[in-house]
Amino acid sequence: MKMHFFILLVITSWLSEKITSLPPDSRVFDRHGFPDNFVFGTAASAFQYEGATSEGGKSPSIWDYFSHTFPERTRMQNADVAVDFYHRYKDDIKLMKELNMDAFRFSISWARLIPSGKVKDGVNKEGVEFYKALIDELVANGIEPSMTLYHWDHPQSLEDEYGGFLSPQIVEDFRDFSRVCFEEFGDKVKMWTTINEPYVITVAGYDTGNKAVGRCSKWVNSKCQGGDSGTEPYIASHHLLLAHAAAVQEFRKCNKTQDGQIGIVLSPLWFEPYDSASPADNEAVKRALATELDWHLDPVIHGDYPEMMKKLAGNRLPSFTPEQSKMLKNSSDFIGINYYTARYVAHIPQADPARPRFVTDHQLQWRVTNHSNHQFGPGEDRGILQSHPEGLRKVLNYIKDKYNNPIVYIKENGINDYDDGTKSREEILNDTFRISYHEDHLQQLQKAIIEDGCDVRGYYVWSLLDNFEWEHGYSTRFGVYYVDYDNDLTRIPKDSVNWFKQFLDVKNKEIWDVSHKERYNKTFDDVESFEASVGSILYLMTNNISRREEEERDQCAFGNLNDQSGLLLESYNSFGFLENVW
């Protein structure tokens, strides 16, 4: 018997190495078609989900101030209650589990954890307890917590005191906030994001003024209460990058986070030329990608801004000191990507130099259709995002080719349905367009991984629930669960819920059918069973075939094979060698 064990040990060691090194099968479109340990999750943010804005010691954030002071800019709606995740998180985590999701990406409210924004004024114990309870509930349900430090909602007090991200003071306050998070939650949270979508924060917050803090030049938007669209986007972005680097420094010093990973999340669209025959439009595409991606990716990888951004912005783009550059370089363990849609780009002449602003510095204009009136995909006519799944694959290949194939996670991907009050609940629940959107994007993601070699390791759906969508209020719905805002915020599954359940349901399927397991429940002392099992393993070693290829063979062929070689493939798994490999 000792020899039997020795032979099996050698064979299974060899086979395990071969099986686990096999690539996923691109012909299989479910969880099995993605690499081992690929993470599927849903995503949310504190302000859009939690509610309870005046409970638990929380102070007003910039979005509380923005939505209450200028309600006309958020459709006369606010997130005081949002979807009440603060009180209902346990039930919502059950929904995640029922969806067969692996992870949940959420953000921590700086204003809830440190109400004044400054550690010297004290950490809010109730805030710490809430997030610890949330994390514990996730872990207890087998859901991996993925925490974002900043998703657009710093305390309004920092805005009042020194102008928020327009001041370098915020870098050290963000460092302190991050340190508290790592010390309090780092033992159970291993996936961290520093800043969510710095491009959106700076452009929408400081150029167009559509989002908090709502600043811009008066000639851009008369509703803005102050600002300079030509300089402030670059200044705020600069401090966001330095805040990211400061947080990463603290992360890498903290003992509790040594086995974790941290990165930044960017939000690129994909771009194609408005007129593919126009050299100017093709050059405009390069500038668009430089502003959407390279502007923030170059610093966290190389330690400096890309040359194109320096050329476009001139002396309005701040520069990094040597120490800052060193701090920024290689400051992301992974790159998070939020991808939603694509646009055509047309070159435009240089704008009036007397009225500089970020969106015209780059001499381009986004278009929904190209010069032939062709659009990327369905959606815009329904008030929802255009679906262009090929753009996701192209974004990933752009990053792979330009930045030496870094680790990437898709941190958000989803599509909205515009709810103007005229649609019935049944219409909204029947979200076949959302099913198609996710299916198409996951197929392109699978191709990017398997065929192109992009190192992508996770995909997060935006979002689990309908929620407060910033300046759009509650008029646009991204959730796979419908939230009935008129009926106690009841969660109702849309059709996409069943699609995701089925897509992810194969997580724990065994590699072979073990319905006859008891029939072949032999011991190593049974020589006949032992020889049959070794024969099965040797057969797999020499043929190197997958489960699915086996199942496609004619069943009578297996019968002949068993007759000729004594192979009992059904008994293969009775020893449990390859449980849950895929």
From Swiss-Prot:
It catalyses: Hydrolysis of terminal, non-reducing beta-D-glucosyl residues with release of beta-D-glucose. Glycans are attached at N255, N330, N370, N430, N521, N544. The active site is at E197, E412. Residues 1-21 form the signal peptide. Keywords: Disulfide bond, Glycoprotein, Glycosidase, Hydrolase, Signal. It is an enzyme of class 3 (hydrolase). A beta-D-glucoside binds at Q48, H151, N196, E197, Y340, E412, W462, E469, W470, F478. GO terms for biological process: carbohydrate metabolic process. Disulfide bonds join C216-C224. GO terms for molecular function: beta-glucosidase activity. Its EC number is 3.2.1.21. It comes from the Eukaryota. PANTHER family: BETA-GLUCOSIDASE 28 (PTHR10353:SF253), GLYCOSYL HYDROLASE (PTHR10353). Belongs to the glycosyl hydrolase 1 family. This is Beta-glucosidase 28.
